């Protein structure tokens, strides 16, 4: 039995620690054959998205079993690690509920890699799911990708961590690979071969890929270098503005806004959704942050 999850960033799949389903989405079980290996499979996906993967031309080659579940009914089910290179240091590989999961595209099941996405980190923390970290030689937890944009090489990791947590035979082929060609100084950005493609080929051979295709979508790029941006966990300084949120909302009501809708609308809504303020954002063109202690 397989969960059919969808992603536009295959390079984050080795860091997967959860799958998210929607709270109000219905899911069904489909018996079919894998299109790449022709092996029999049973998959779970959103009922609304079945026609996107099982067309009328395919009738007779698949069967919707009739079993169905709402998203929360799948919560807590455990699954096998998709790419077992690194053991997580905590609870992982469970189905969780994510409030941002939709059926606008994909399969209605979202792959969660807490170390490479703010939403992923948020829902994983709420569900008690551990992120997948490595430990470097300094003893610090690090995501699988280093700050140069490549999978950590084994020599930069803590030997004891490597011994106990990494399947070296499986990982060594990909250690040191850049997740985006734009980061690799030795190859051109327009080279056809990418890490994403190589991972897709690997998953095909392992009967773990169901549909692989090119997908055009927006992606953030650095305005100075024109290179793709990675969402990455970094040490930062924060001001705990959430501790004063309720007080600021009260005080906002005493302000005579002109027009009044600014205070109750744009600014008021901003206060209601206030998060802790990150004041030490890391940029390669940044300047030192002055801090005064009183």
Give the residues covered by each predicted segment.
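Non-cofactor substrate-recognition interfaces
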Residues: 1-4, 10-294
């Amino acid at each position: 039995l397989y969960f059919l999850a969808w992603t536009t960033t295959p390079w984050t799949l080795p860091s997967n620690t959860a799958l998210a389903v929607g709270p109000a989405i219905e899911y069904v079980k489909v018996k079919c054959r894998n299109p790449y290996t022709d092996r029999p499979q049973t998959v779970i996906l959103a009922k609304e998205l079945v026609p996107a993967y099982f067309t009328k031309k395919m009738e007779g080659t698949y069967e919707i079993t009739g079993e169905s579940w709402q998203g929360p009914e799948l919560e807590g089910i455990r699954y096998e690690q998709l790419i077992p290179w690194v053991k997580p240091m905590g609870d992982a590989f469970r189905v969780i509920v994510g409030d941002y999961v939709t059926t606008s595209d994909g399969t209605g099941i979202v792959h969660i890699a807490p170390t490479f996405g703010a939403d992923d980190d948020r829902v994983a923390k709420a569900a008690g799911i551990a992120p997948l970290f490595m430990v470097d030689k300094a003893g610090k937890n690090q995501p699988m990708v280093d700050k140069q944009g490549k999978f950590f090489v084994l020599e930069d990791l803590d030997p004891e961590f490597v011994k106990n947590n990494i399947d070296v035979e499986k990982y060594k082929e990909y250690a040191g690979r850049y997740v985006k060609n734009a980061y690799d100084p030795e190859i051109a950005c327009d080279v056809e071969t990418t890490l994403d493609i190589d991972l897709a080929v690997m998953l095909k051979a392992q009967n773990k890929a169901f549909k692989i295709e090119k997908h055009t979508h927006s992606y953030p790029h650095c305005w100075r270098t024109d290179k793709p941006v990675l969402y990455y966990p970094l040490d930062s300084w924060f001001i705990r503005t959430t501790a004063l949120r309720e007080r600021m909302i009260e005080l906002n009501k005493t302000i005579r806004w002109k027009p009044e809708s600014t205070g109750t609308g744009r600014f008021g809504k901003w206060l209601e959704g206030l998060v802790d303020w990150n004041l030490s954002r890391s940029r390669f063109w940044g300047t030192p942050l002055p801090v005064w202690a009183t």
